């Protein structure tokens, strides 16, 4: 009898606790619909079920906030201003948001779990961002580890971007085998040397990443991207390869791809100052976009130079395009430095790292480098070396423009 009584009492206690938890949850967590008020504008505001991330809620209502990392909290792009609701700022946001910005309501939309009504502010340009389903025109190697992806915009549509802007590209869950990649013979040596065809990329959920555009606004009807394959570093050979770059490298003509945009902050200043562009690797993309825009669309008379770093001649691309621009424009010069020229290159040009070449062959004798505008995009080590060199020359932050995505 005592055992039965004990079981009954235990069951009653568990039931009572369950009821208490459910009651507390009903009071503390909004499981119904909430309202997101945007810019105090009823036409932009919406109602949705509580519990999702703000970034996802906005996207599902056709409002696409930039998020290069796909909502992982690592890029810090999806900034919104929350005027009411949203709870306390999370530790994951503090590396991207200063104390002053936090006091002003700045949050990362991908980290805000919406449990109550919100009042938020968004920049007006966000409402011009749209989605398109594009068709792959071509996807060809331009260098050993870089492909040029050319996408066709749907007939009659226009992506109203500015030079230096970027789009976001979406990938559904997939499995990609590197052995299936179409890598031309001239580039296969390094792929075989590093045994790269053994890799596979597996995505179990949708992925979104940002890529800078290589085309300029008057190249109508297309989107042009330079995509470097993100293989595991030699020091961590068992790490997974990059999901999005692997997906893009697997694309073939005729495939469909969803993009959203345009986004961007890496825009040219409207001044008469000299422009110095510095790039490396897939950082070529925004360099091409800017330089083509300045010389082909704007017919700029500003003094412009482009300094590009590559390993060897095989890693150079768009060479004929820039040679032609140089021949047609007296105000434009471009220079390449090879860090590891091969014997077959028969290279007689600059050698070494591009920041040293730029300094030794131009900036050290420049009468006023601090008056120039510097636009750069490349591998992180290149970016850091260039910025240090420019700071040592007295160039202010306002004249150093960096695109973090193209490299």
From Swiss-Prot:
Gene3D superfamilies: 3.10.20.30, Nucleotide-binding domain of ferredoxin-NADP reductase (FNR) module, Translation factors
Alphabetical UniProt keywords: 2Fe-2S, Cell inner membrane, Cell membrane, FAD, Flavoprotein, Ion transport, Iron, Iron-sulfur, Membrane, Metal-binding, NAD, Sodium, Sodium transport, Translocase, Transmembrane, Transmembrane helix, Transport, Ubiquinone
Domain (2Fe-2S ferredoxin-type): residue spans on this chain: 32-126
FAD-binding FR-type domain sequence ranges: 129-269
Residues making up the signal peptide according to the UniProt record: none
Transmembrane region(s): 3-23
Catalytic activity, EC: 7.2.1.1
InterPro entries tied to this protein: 2Fe-2S_ferredoxin-like_sf, 2Fe-2S_ferredoxin-type, Beta-grasp_dom_sf, Cbr1-like_FAD-bd_dom, FAD-bd_FR_type, Flavoprot_Pyr_Nucl_cyt_Rdtase, FNR_nucleotide-bd, NqrF
GO terms for biological process, alphabetical: sodium ion transport
Molecular-function GO term, any one: oxidoreductase activity, acting on NAD(P)H, quinone or similar compound as acceptor
Main location: membrane
Subcellular location: Cell inner membrane
UniProt: [2Fe-2S] cluster binding residues: 69, 75, 78, 110
Topology within the bilayer: Single-pass membrane protein
PANTHER family tied to this protein: NA(+)-TRANSLOCATING NADH-QUINONE REDUCTASE SUBUNIT, NAD(P)H-FLAVIN REDUCTASE
Assembly and binders: Composed of six subunits; NqrA, NqrB, NqrC, NqrD, NqrE and NqrF.
Recorded family membership: Belongs to the NqrF family.
Function: NQR complex catalyzes the reduction of ubiquinone-1 to ubiquinol by two successive reactions, coupled with the transport of Na(+) ions from the cytoplasm to the periplasm. The first step is catalyzed by NqrF, which accepts electrons from NADH and reduces ubiquinone-1 to ubisemiquinone by a one-electron transfer pathway.
Name of the protein in question: Na(+)-translocating NADH-quinone reductase subunit F
